[in-house]
């Protein structure tokens, strides 16, 4: 049975809650001692992981809609992508304001150059920014065929963001490896699409 437009609307409501509730939890954890002895790192990792989760969810929509024969699922992809950008922005903001400090933002440029994993992170964020700004139907009409070409760059983020996570941790743990593996699996599902590009 295929999902109806009304069911998709309710699904979108649930996805908005999924994007917002982690923020409420984070505020609660900050104010009630729910973080570790290094709360700044906790906030950075939590926001970064949440952005990655929404990135993976965004990449999952197309193959899921195709294999499950639920074409209306595609309508949730933009919403998931926007939440990915929101959490990626919170991740970047937490680094800039909590790690560097508001009085040391001038150091951000040198930090990006001296730490390659930060370079990958900012490239990913800039791509997400471009995709967010052009996610409207108006932008799609204006860009025409170029719109799809631009939005295919999300696959670059699917490569760079997990590498950014892997590179940023001092001690390799299963979590970043799992995220990287899931990203590769979702990219592998698009093998035929990538193969057509290179013909």
Curated annotation (Swiss-Prot):
Binds 1 FMN per subunit. Its main location: membrane. The keyword DNA-binding does not apply. Keywords: Cell inner membrane, Cell membrane, Electron transport, Flavoprotein, FMN, Heme, Iron, Membrane, Metal-binding, Transmembrane, Transmembrane helix, Transport. GO terms for cellular component: plasma membrane. The keyword 4Fe-4S does not apply. It is a multi-pass membrane protein. InterPro entries: Fe3_Rdtase_TM_dom (IPR013130), MsrQ-like (IPR022837). Its cofactor is FMN; heme b. GO terms for molecular function: electron transfer activity; FMN binding; heme binding; metal ion binding; oxidoreductase activity, acting on diphenols and related substances as donors. Part of the MsrPQ system that repairs oxidized periplasmic proteins containing methionine sulfoxide residues (Met-O), using respiratory chain electrons. Thus protects these proteins from oxidative-stress damage caused by reactive species of oxygen and chlorine generated by the host defense mechanisms. MsrPQ is essential for the maintenance of envelope integrity under bleach stress, rescuing a wide series of structurally unrelated periplasmic proteins from methionine oxidation, including the primary periplasmic chaperone SurA and the lipoprotein Pal. NCBIfam families: PRK05419.1-2, PRK05419.1-4. This is Protein-methionine-sulfoxide reductase heme-binding subunit MsrQ. It comes from Salmonella dublin (strain CT_02021853). The gene is msrQ.
């Amino acid at each position: 049975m295929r999902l109806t437009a009304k069911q998709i609307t309710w699904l979108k409501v649930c996805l908005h809650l999924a994007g917002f509730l982690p923020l409420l939890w984070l505020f609660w954890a900050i104010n009630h001692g729910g973080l570790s002895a290094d709360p700044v790192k906790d906030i950075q990792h939590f926001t970064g992981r949440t952005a990655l989760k929404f990135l993976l969810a965004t990449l999952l929509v197309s193959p899921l809609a195709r294999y499950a024969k639920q074409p209306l699922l595609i309508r949730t992809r933009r919403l998931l992508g926007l939440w990915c950008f929101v959490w990626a922005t919170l991740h970047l903001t937490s680094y800039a304001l909590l790690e560097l400090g508001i009085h040391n933002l001038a150091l951000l440029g040198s930090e990006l150059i001296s730490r390659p994993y930060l370079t990958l992170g900012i490239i990913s964020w800039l791509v997400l920014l471009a995709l967010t700004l052009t996610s409207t139907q108006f932008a799609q009409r204006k860009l025409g065929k170029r719109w799809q070409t631009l939005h295919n760059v999300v696959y670059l983020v699917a490569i760079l963001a997990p590498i950014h996570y892997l590179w940023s941790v001092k001690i390799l743990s299963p979590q970043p490896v799992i995220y990287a593996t899931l990203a590769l699996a979702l990219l592998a599902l698009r093998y035929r699409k990538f193969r057509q590009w290179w013909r």
